[in-house]
Design a protein with these regions (language model features):
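N-terminal Rossmann-like NAD(P)+-binding subdomain of aldehyde/semialdehyde dehydrogenases
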Residues: 1-120
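Short acidic-hydrophobic, aromatic-tinged amphipathic segments that line or gate anion-handling sites
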Residues: 2-7, 179-184, 304-309
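Flexible, glycine/charged-enriched surface loops at secondary-structure junctions
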Residues: 99-104, 226, 263-268, 288-298, ...
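Conserved small-residue-rich beta-alpha loop and adjacent elements
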Residues: 104-170
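Conserved NAD(P)+-binding/catalytic subdomain of aldehyde/semialdehyde dehydrogenases
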Residues: 176-264
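A glycine- and small/hydrophobic-rich beta-loop-beta segment
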Residues: 259, 267-342
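C-terminal core of ALDH-fold dehydrogenases
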Residues: 319-427
Length: 427
């Protein structure tokens, strides 16, 4: 990890730079080719790309009820219990987000209100890669089920034997997924965006993935389907003072670094002593990790930053807009109130980022790459739309009609004015 001591504000942009992405032109062209082929050839193209990229030959894309039942038997009892606990907490937290619309009378005779309606068809993408992300199944399917989405479709790449990880299937069944398909990468995004003979077309796609999946989601979102948010490599920042435990801080930094070689971990602290202790602890704990090679590469683009005071630490944090922010300071609740840009915040020394990743109840699908300045993480709202309604009676049209006529006339929209005028003549 690179150490930076008392950075000047003019250098912040460079210091906070994320790891470089792949060449966008090459990426865009490769992704477009796959999207176009799946759009025109359907299942056939998906199976061809599965054979090419995932090294598996599939007779069909759908996961059967028999496969789901078999998978349930393969999941260890202790893992089932952990998944059930996590799902319960996620369900509890997201259920509390239900929207209760109320009718508002803006003036006598004019009533307005909103109604929350579920997105009917949603698609969930669950990556394969180096680890089975069954936790992401819970994070996406649970709020979709609470929202009342009628069709919850899940795509995930199979292994070379054509099987989906048992824990993914178990979590999917528990959280209410309707249909599961063996498809990964760009071809999975294309299948859900356009529909194939097997995979239904959905209205919105959720889920993380590599740079190809991210690019595919962005391309299909231009015309064909909505997506959850722009996504990039995972990241964490720990904001700490001299009271923080260096063992905890190092563990939190490494828990993010092991996600992938392009992940980023940052420490911003007011304590030089803590920075040195964390630097030592990171190296000590790194050697003990099973995924140490991945974490080590990630640490190459990670930083330990010493600042002059907490005001500077907060300003630097809000500029970085981290996906995950852990605050380990003496007055962490007070400092938390000053945070305006972050995906999810973890408060105090006993609140690791891992808790939000799995079982505290909050969602771990969060904005990365600085998008926390403008985007929220996934929540119940991500799976609903709010439709507005208005009702106007005779008194109401008399109260607002003349103003509408004046405004429409001044915008030179005569038909708009007339739609009010003909009504005013009848009341």
């Amino acid at each position: 990890m690179k150490k930076i001591i008392y950075p000047e504000k003019k250098d912040w942009m460079e210091i906070l730079r994320r790891p470089a992405a792949l060449n966008t032109d090459t990426l865009r062209n490769t992704v477009k080719e796959v999207l176009d082929k799946v759009k025109t050839e359907g299942d056939k193209a998906v199976r061809e790309y599965e054979e090419r990229f995932d090294k598996v030959k599939l007779d069909s894309l759908g996961v059967t009820e028999t496969e789901i039942a078999e998978a349930e038997k393969e999941v260890p009892i202790e893992l089932k219990a952990a998944i059930m606990l996590a799902q319960k907490n996620i369900h509890t937290f997201h259920s509390s987000q239900r929207f209760e619309g109320k009718k508002v009378q803006t003036v006598p005779g004019v009533t307005c209100w909103q109604k929350a309606v579920a997105i009917e068809k949603v698609g969930l993408y669950i990556p394969g890669g180096t680890a089975p992300l069954f936790s992401t199944v819970l994070m996406l399917a649970t709020p979709a089920q609470i929202a009342g989405c009628k069709e919850i479709v899940l795509c995930t790449p199979p292994d070379k034997e054509g099987k989906v990880h048992p824990a993914i299937l178990y979590a999917a069944k528990l959280a209410g997924v309707n249909k599961i398909f063996k498809a990964g990468g760009v071809q999975a995004i294309a299948a859900m965006a356009y529909g194939t003979e097997s995979v239904p077309k959905v209205y919105k796609i959720f889920g993380p993935g590599n740079q190809y999946v991210t690019a595919a989601k962005q391309q299909v979102s231009l015309r064909d389907v909505a997506i959850d948010m722009p996504a990039g490599p995972s990241e964490v920042e720990v904001l700490a003072d001299e009271t923080a435990n260096p063992v905890f801080v190092a563990a939190d930094l490494l828990s993010q670094a092991e996600h992938g070689v392009d992940s980023q971990a940052m420490l911003i602290t007011t304590s030089e002593k803590l920075m040195k202790e964390v630097e030592y602890e990171v190296q000590r704990q790194l050697a003990l990790l099973p995924r140490w090679e991945i974490a080590e590469k990630s640490l190459a683009s990670s930083k330990l930053i010493l600042v002059r005071d907490m005001d500077e630490a907060i300003a630097l944090t809000n500029e970085y807009a981290p996906e995950h922010l852990i605050i380990e300071t003496r007055d962490y609740m007070e400092q938390a109130e000053r945070i305006v840009n972050a995906g999810s915040v973890f408060l105090g020394s006993l609140t690791p980022e891992s808790a939000g990743d799995y079982a505290s109840g909050t969602n771990h699908t969060l904005p990365t790459n600085g998008y926390a300045k403008a985007y929220s993480g996934v929540s119940l709202d991500s799976f609903i739309r709010k439709i507005t309604f208005q009702e106007i009676n005779g008194e109401g049209i008399q109260n607002i009609g003349p103003a509408i006529e004046v405004m429409a006339a001044n915008e030179q929209l005569g038909a708009h004015k007339n739609a009010v005028t003909v009504r005013l003549k009848t009341v």
